[in-house]
C-alpha cells in the first residue's frame, strides 16, 4: 500500500493513494473509497509504502494493538510514561523517517534527536519497525505477494476474479524464525503466512501484534517425506563405511537427511544386518576377506594384514571379488552362521569320501571296468554334491528367514522406544521453555518495580531537600 507523506501544516492524517491490483483486503477497498473523496495532492510529494496490515495507524489516535504491545505507556504506573508522551515519540520517529525518505533510519539517528530514556525509544522504534511504519522496503511492493504465488498457474483474468486456492503442503517446512527444518510438527498462521517450529512458538519468536491463538498445530507425517534415491543410498553406504555408527557425520554426508532418516533407511536395507558385528557371523566374514585377499595378486601392492578388521567387516557383499563362486559361498556362510556352514561342509566331504572309496574298490576288483566306473563315479559325485548343496541351501534359507524375522522385530521395538523418547524429550523441552518464559516475565516485573522504587525514592529525596531549604 502506498501512502502520501503527511502535510506538516495539516491535521497529520495519512492520505492513502489509489491501491494497486495486488491489494485484496477490505482495508484496501476502504482506503480506495476514501482516496476518491479526498483531493489529490501535488505530484512532488514522494509516495511512502507501508504494508496493508498497518492501515490502523492514525496520527492522533492510539490503536488497541499499541496498548497491548507497549503497556508501560498506558498503565499509569510511571508519571513520565503516558499516552501523550507515547504519541510524541511515535509521531517524531515516523516524521523523521518520512523527512529522510527513502533512506532508512537507524536507532542511533532517532536517539540523537529525541530526549527520553533509551529503553522507551528502543521499544517504540522496534514496534514501528515491526509493523512496517518505518524502514519498510519500497521495492518490496513490486515483488509478488503470497496469494499471487499461489495463483501463478492461473491467468491474469482468473486471478483478478477468482479467489486464491490453497496449495499442497510441501514435505519440508522451514521455520520463519530460526530458518530450521520442522521435523515432527509446526505451528502455522495462515493470516500472516508464518510457519514456526515448536521452540520459536514457545519463545514467542514472531512480530508484535500477532496472538498465539492465531496459530494452529500442523502434524508433519513421515509418509510425506520423499523416497530415497539410488544416489542417496550410495552416499549412505559410503558414509557408514567411513564413519561407522557416528550418525551425525553420516547425516552430514547424506545431504538433506536427518540422523533419524539415515538410521531408518539403513535398517531397511536388504543387507543391512551384515554391517552389525554379530558373534555368529564374524568368522564367516573373516573367511570371505581371506579368500578375497588370497585371490588378489601380490603385484598390486596390497598388504593383506594392513586393513583393519572394522573395514573388512564393512565390505559390501561380493564387492571386487576376483573369484565369485568362493565369494558367494563365503557370503552365504556368513549369513547362515558357522554351525550351518560347518554341517554342510562336513556332509559334502563325507559324500565325496564315500564315492571315492567305492570307486577305488571297484577299480581294484575289475581293472577292465575302470573306465565305466570312472564315468559312473563322476555322475554319482555330481548327484551327491547337488543333494548336499540343496540341503545346505535349505538350512541357509531357514536360518536366514529366522534371522531376518528376529532383526525386524528387534528394530521395530527399538524404533518404538526411540520415538517414545523423542516425544518425551520434546514435551520436556516445551515445559522448560514455558518455565523460562515465565521466569523472564517475573524478572521484567521485578525490574519495573525496582525502577518505580528508584524514581519514588529520588522524588522523595528531592521533596525533602526542598522542605529543608
From Swiss-Prot:
<keyword id="KW-0010">Activator</keyword>
<dbReference type="Pfam" id="PF16495">
    <property type="entry name" value="SWIRM-assoc_1"/>
</dbReference>
<dbReference type="InterPro" id="IPR036388">
    <property type="entry name" value="WH-like_DNA-bd_sf"/>
</dbReference>
<dbReference type="InterPro" id="IPR032451">
    <property type="entry name" value="SMARCC_C"/>
</dbReference>
<feature type="compositionally biased region" description="Polar residues">
    <location>
        <begin position="370"/>
        <end position="380"/>
    </location>
</feature>
<keyword id="KW-0156">Chromatin regulator</keyword>
<comment type="function">
    <text>Component of a multiprotein complex equivalent of the SWI/SNF complex, an ATP-dependent chromatin-remodeling complex, which is required for the positive and negative regulation of gene expression of a large number of genes. It changes chromatin structure by altering DNA-histone contacts within a nucleosome, leading eventually to a change in nucleosome position, thus facilitating or repressing binding of gene-specific transcription factors. May play an essential role in the transition from the vegetative to the reproductive phase of development. May be a positive regulator of ABA signaling.</text>
</comment>
<dbReference type="GO" id="GO:0005634">
    <property type="term" value="C:nucleus"/>
</dbReference>
<keyword id="KW-0539">Nucleus</keyword>
<dbReference type="GO" id="GO:0003677">
    <property type="term" value="F:DNA binding"/>
</dbReference>
<dbReference type="InterPro" id="IPR001005">
    <property type="entry name" value="SANT/Myb"/>
</dbReference>
<dbReference type="InterPro" id="IPR017884">
    <property type="entry name" value="SANT_dom"/>
</dbReference>
<feature type="compositionally biased region" description="Basic and acidic residues">
    <location>
        <begin position="293"/>
        <end position="306"/>
    </location>
</feature>
<feature type="compositionally biased region" description="Low complexity">
    <location>
        <begin position="15"/>
        <end position="42"/>
    </location>
</feature>
<dbReference type="Pfam" id="PF04433">
    <property type="entry name" value="SWIRM"/>
</dbReference>
<feature type="region of interest" description="Disordered">
    <location>
        <begin position="293"/>
        <end position="314"/>
    </location>
</feature>
<dbReference type="InterPro" id="IPR007526">
    <property type="entry name" value="SWIRM"/>
</dbReference>
<dbReference type="InterPro" id="IPR017930">
    <property type="entry name" value="Myb_dom"/>
</dbReference>
<keyword id="KW-0804">Transcription</keyword>
<feature type="region of interest" description="Disordered">
    <location>
        <begin position="1"/>
        <end position="42"/>
    </location>
</feature>
<keyword id="KW-0175">Coiled coil</keyword>
<dbReference type="Pfam" id="PF00249">
    <property type="entry name" value="Myb_DNA-binding"/>
</dbReference>
<feature type="compositionally biased region" description="Basic and acidic residues">
    <location>
        <begin position="360"/>
        <end position="369"/>
    </location>
</feature>
<feature type="domain" description="SANT">
    <location>
        <begin position="223"/>
        <end position="274"/>
    </location>
</feature>
<feature type="region of interest" description="Disordered">
    <location>
        <begin position="360"/>
        <end position="387"/>
    </location>
</feature>
<dbReference type="InterPro" id="IPR009057">
    <property type="entry name" value="Homeodomain-like_sf"/>
</dbReference>
<dbReference type="GO" id="GO:0016514">
    <property type="term" value="C:SWI/SNF complex"/>
</dbReference>
<dbReference type="GO" id="GO:0006338">
    <property type="term" value="P:chromatin remodeling"/>
</dbReference>
<feature type="coiled-coil region">
    <location>
        <begin position="423"/>
        <end position="447"/>
    </location>
</feature>
<keyword id="KW-0217">Developmental protein</keyword>
<keyword id="KW-0805">Transcription regulation</keyword>
<feature type="domain" description="SWIRM">
    <location>
        <begin position="48"/>
        <end position="145"/>
    </location>
</feature>
<comment type="subunit">
    <text>Homodimers and heterodimers. Interacts with SWI3A, SWI3C, SWI3D, BSH, BRM and FCA (via C-terminus), and (via N-terminus) with HAB1. Interacts with MORC6 and SUVH9.</text>
</comment>
<keyword id="KW-0238">DNA-binding</keyword>
<protein>
    <recommendedName>
        <fullName>SWI/SNF complex subunit SWI3B</fullName>
    </recommendedName>
</protein>
